[in-house]
Amino acid sequence: SSDVCSSDLNNSTKLAFALLYIGFSTKAFIVPFHPLAADAHGAAPASISVLISGVLTKSGIYGIIRLTYFLFQTMGLGSFQFLLVFVGSVSMFVCVTMALAQHDFKRLLAYHSISQIGYVLTAVGLCTGLGFSAGLYHAMNHTLFKGLLFLAAGAVLYQTGTTDLDELGGLSKKMPWTTGLFLVGAFSISGLPPFNGFASKWMIYQATYEKAAETGNIGFLLVTVIALVTSVLTLASFVKVSQSVFFGRLPAKFENVTEVRPGMIIAMCIFAVLCVATGLFPSFVTRFVTEPAARAAFSVVQYIDAMMGTGYAATVMGEDLPIVATVSFTQVGYWSPVSWLLVLCITLLAVTIVAVSARYDCVSQSRGEAVEAKYDLFFGGEESVYSQVGGGDLFWGFKHNWRHYFDFMHRLHSGVVNDYALWAAVALSLAIVFIQIVL
């Protein structure tokens, strides 16, 4: 692996770096600018949400990459990686927990989008060849599976007129194509093999672990744990969405809902096929896409020559050519996706057998709140041998145990623009102080 080299920066350069970093962070919607993403996606049409998630947020990450690896690479940013990794890890965890608490389909996807951007920022911030390659791979994968998920949410909104998770349910009976394609996106973002999210997340886990082994810094092991926990919570969140939107009881008002037009299905199919293909053939992606980009990122000379022509950097810079360490990619692009697919199929088969053999008979008698209520049902005093999955919040126990954390997050996310402007000012101040002191 390779670390960015170090030298001295003057105060003006540090201030410029801090201002540029905050600007690109705002464009990427990373913490503490994440509430902007939820509002933007909530108001935008599904097709625009695909562009916001797939292009706009990536432009912020691209700016940070250019800032870190090209503009300031030879000016001493070795310590800056800790800020990027910290902010990326916080974005991962905070936004996935915010997603768990959402009751709107598109706002939930918006918070997941920023959580996945946290993965990308963390990987890029490691300043290693493997980490950079993993970050680019996950950025590409995020564009694919999040585009698919937003199109699925748009299909649901188009046919039902709502994205309220508490009003939806049972749509798999009416929209089987949308349901199946949504599940492909859900499995991909959750990091399940053989979909693309597993491949890129596995690279990120490996990159953070190797960084910890190389530096002896136990903090990078904590980052690995945070990334793994975030994946588990992501899967939990999409289990919630699946049972709230596509499974369970179909409300009477949606009895006449039909599948979306073929053109909308084809668009989702394209994303779904790419999610599977980039997961089954990760070595192709790393060899021809991410590895060349990573090599260019760690060599300013190579990047300049790629943009301006071979030999241009040597002609213009002469003896001032920057020297960076070589990058090792010995373990990039090696997986056995077929083996992991076999393990997944066996596990799913075992779970299905257990679930079918342990099913219960349904009883209709219930006291307290209506069975249709999807939140805090069991406070209503319901007494029955069996209750519908769609009738309760699957993760109420988790949220109850974390109630103080969620109450704190609820108070922070007040919805008042002035509060969010204060967050931006505080973030800018902290970035300036960190860069002035540490770099």
What are these regions (language model features)?
Residues 2-253, 260:
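Hydrophobic transmembrane alpha-helices and their helix-loop junctions in integral membrane proteins
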Residues 18-24, 92-96, 185-189, 227-231, ...:
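Hydrophobic core segments of alpha-helical transmembrane domains in multi-pass membrane transport
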Residues 27, 231-241, 245, 275, ...:
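Transmembrane-helix bundle segments that line or gate the permeation/cavity pathway
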Residues 99-100, 127, 242-245, 276-283, ...:
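Transmembrane helix-loop junctions and nearby membrane-interface residues
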Residues 174-182, 258-273, 419-424:
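Alpha-helical transmembrane segments and their helix-start/interface "positive-inside/aromatic belt" motifs
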Residues 182-193, 267-295, 430-431:
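Hydrophobic alpha-helical membrane-insertion segments
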Residues 251-259, 266, 278:
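Soluble mature domains adjacent to a membrane tether on cell-surface and organelle-surface proteins
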Residues 284-439:
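Aromatic-capped, Gly/Pro-kinked transmembrane alpha-helices
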